[in-house]
């Protein structure tokens, strides 16, 4: 097992590059199953556990996958299996993305119900309902989604998502791209990763209108073609690094980033007193000595993202006043709060709202990661804490942050990765 050891109290400064988006990469990797021949090549793919998990899943169903130096190539002409097994899907919820491409191209799929971060219910019913509306027969059996189409394959349909869902929107887009007729999606997700998936599919030959709006119209085509493409930036990694600068009262510049993807996040940094400037591909943040409190409501894009909620709670422990953070997307996503309180935070949770009382001096301690973004929040707190903080079980972190400790060290953080024996007996003194 590995942990991160952090000696806090040092302001961050310098320049660092932002990695390619994990969430975008996973979606377009699944889309690479749609062409019947050739090789799709994707640049700027982050070297993450989730990327390797999906790569292995694609290999199991027969795709040829090569990953080297942040470039991923996928040849899907020889797919011979249509099952995504539990052993892989349990590791990552995004594995369900193969459902739409397999159904759209082959008319059949067997996908284990997914795993991933454990913070409350995140049902897959929207995915299943959409596939049924496109004409698939679906049953749940022995922990699997078993889906088949009629002889004619999928057919276009009108689908109104009752809640905005990135995963369901992406999966339905990929299935509808090869369906017969026209599919209309309403209340579709607006996230940059969905916009980029639409553009990626269009480049493959799909016909999609309404890109960047909540209403998407997909005219099915007979065939899609392999392409070469560059992945977009990871806006959540960017937001996390900016929060690291703010919580340490530092000054950093991020490069290879699209500020337009972080509009709501940047507005909140300005609200707490940070100076923020941008170019087309860079963001500079300078934090004040005294941070102001800020209330946040996590909502679907373009509002403040739920994937920054945990980091914002950590940051608000160092703001001068009371902040309230409401999560309207994942209402039970507060596993990080008890661990932040172990470091000295004063945070209470009621229903889907956390109330943070700052400024609270933080002190180093051992804390336990419970999920991906919780891990990031504990690192931020450790950077601000007096003394040494040990963040255990950082395998959660490795699902979504590429060498985050190296990037933080480049900015001056005193942070290192160590191995430890989780079951070792403590030494009594």
UniProtKB/Swiss-Prot annotation:
Active site: 117 (proton donor)
Pathway membership: Cell wall biogenesis; peptidoglycan biosynthesis
Annotated localization: Cytoplasm
GO biological process: cell division; cell wall organization; peptidoglycan biosynthetic process; regulation of cell shape; UDP-N-acetylgalactosamine biosynthetic process
Catalytic reaction equation(s): phosphoenolpyruvate + UDP-N-acetyl-alpha-D-glucosamine = UDP-N-acetyl-3-O-(1-carboxyvinyl)-alpha-D-glucosamine + phosphate
Enzyme nomenclature, EC number: 2.5.1.7
Superkingdom classification of source: Bacteria
Pfam families with a match to the protein in the record: EPSP_synthase
Residue numbers binding UDP-N-acetyl-alpha-D-glucosamine: 93, 122-126, 307, 329
Cellular component, GO, one term: cytoplasm
Keywords: Cell cycle, Cell division, Cell shape, Cell wall biogenesis/degradation, Cytoplasm, Peptidoglycan synthesis, Pyruvate, Transferase
EC class (word): transferase
PTM annotation (2-(S-cysteinyl)pyruvic acid O-phosphothioketal): residues: 117
Gene Ontology terms, MF aspect: UDP-N-acetylglucosamine 1-carboxyvinyltransferase activity
UniProt key word Cytoplasm: yes
InterPro entries: Enolpyruvate_Tfrase_dom, Enolpyruvate_Tfrase_sf, MurA_subfamily, RNA3'P_cycl/enolpyr_Trfase_a/b, UDP_GlcNAc_COvinyl_MurA
Positions that bind phosphoenolpyruvate: 22-23
Job description of the protein: Cell wall formation. Adds enolpyruvyl to UDP-N-acetylglucosamine.
Family: Belongs to the EPSP synthase family. MurA subfamily.
Protein's recorded name: UDP-N-acetylglucosamine 1-carboxyvinyltransferase
Source organism of the structure: Chloroherpeton thalassium (strain ATCC 35110 / GB-78)
């Amino acid at each position: 097992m590995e942990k991160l050891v952090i000696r806090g109290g040092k302001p961050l400064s310098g320049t660092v590059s932002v990695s390619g988006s994990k969430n975008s990469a996973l979606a377009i990797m699944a889309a690479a199953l749609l062409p019947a021949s050739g090789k799709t090549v994707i640049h700027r793919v982050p070297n993450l556990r989730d990327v390797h998990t999906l790569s292995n899943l694609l290999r199991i169903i027969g795709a040829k996958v090569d990953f080297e130096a942040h470039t991923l190539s996928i040849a899907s002409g020889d797919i011979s299996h249509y099952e995504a097994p539990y052993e892989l899907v349990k590791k990552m919820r995004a594995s369900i993305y193969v459902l739409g491409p397999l159904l759209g191209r082959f008319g059949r799929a067997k996908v284990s119900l997914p795993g991933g971060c454990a913070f409350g219910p995140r049902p897959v019913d929207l995915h299943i309902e959409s596939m049924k509306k496109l004409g698939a027969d679906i049953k749940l059996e022995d922990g699997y989604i078993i889906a088949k189409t009629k002889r004619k394959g999928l057919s276009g349909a009108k689908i109104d998502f009752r809640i905005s869902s990135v995963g369901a929107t992406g999966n339905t887009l990929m299935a509808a791209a090869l369906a017969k007729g026209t599919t209309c999606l309403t209340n579709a997700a607006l996230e940059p990763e969905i916009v980029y998936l639409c553009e990626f599919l269009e480049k493959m030959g799909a016909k999609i209108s309404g890109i960047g709006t909540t209403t998407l119209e997909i005219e099915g085509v007979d065939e899609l073609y392999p392409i070469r493409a560059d992945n977009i930036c990871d806006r959540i990694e960017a937001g996390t690094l900016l929060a690291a600068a703010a919580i340490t009262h530092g000054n950093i510049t991020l490069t290879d980033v699209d500020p337009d993807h972080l509009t709501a996040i940047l507005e909140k940094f300005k609200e707490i007193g940070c100076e923020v400037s941008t170019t087309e591909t860079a963001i500079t943040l300078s934090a004040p000595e005294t941070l102001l409190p800020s209330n946040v409501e996590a909502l679907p894009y373009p509002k403040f993202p739920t994937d920054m909620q945990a980091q914002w709670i950590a940051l608000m422990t160092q703001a001068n006043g009371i902040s309230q953070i409401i999560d309207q997307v994942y209402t039970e996503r507060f596993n990080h709060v008890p661990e932040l309180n172990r470091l000295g935070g004063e945070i209470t949770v009621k229903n889907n709202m956390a109330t943070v009382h700052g400024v609270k001096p933080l002190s180093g301690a051992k804390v336990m990661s419970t999920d991906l973004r919780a891990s990031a929040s504990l690192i931020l707190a450790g950077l601000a804490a007096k003394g040494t903080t040990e963040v255990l079980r950082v395998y959660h972190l490795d699902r979504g942050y590429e060498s985050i400790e190296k990037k933080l060290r480049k900015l001056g953080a005193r942070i290192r990765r160590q191995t430890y024996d989780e079951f070792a007996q403590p030494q009594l003194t």
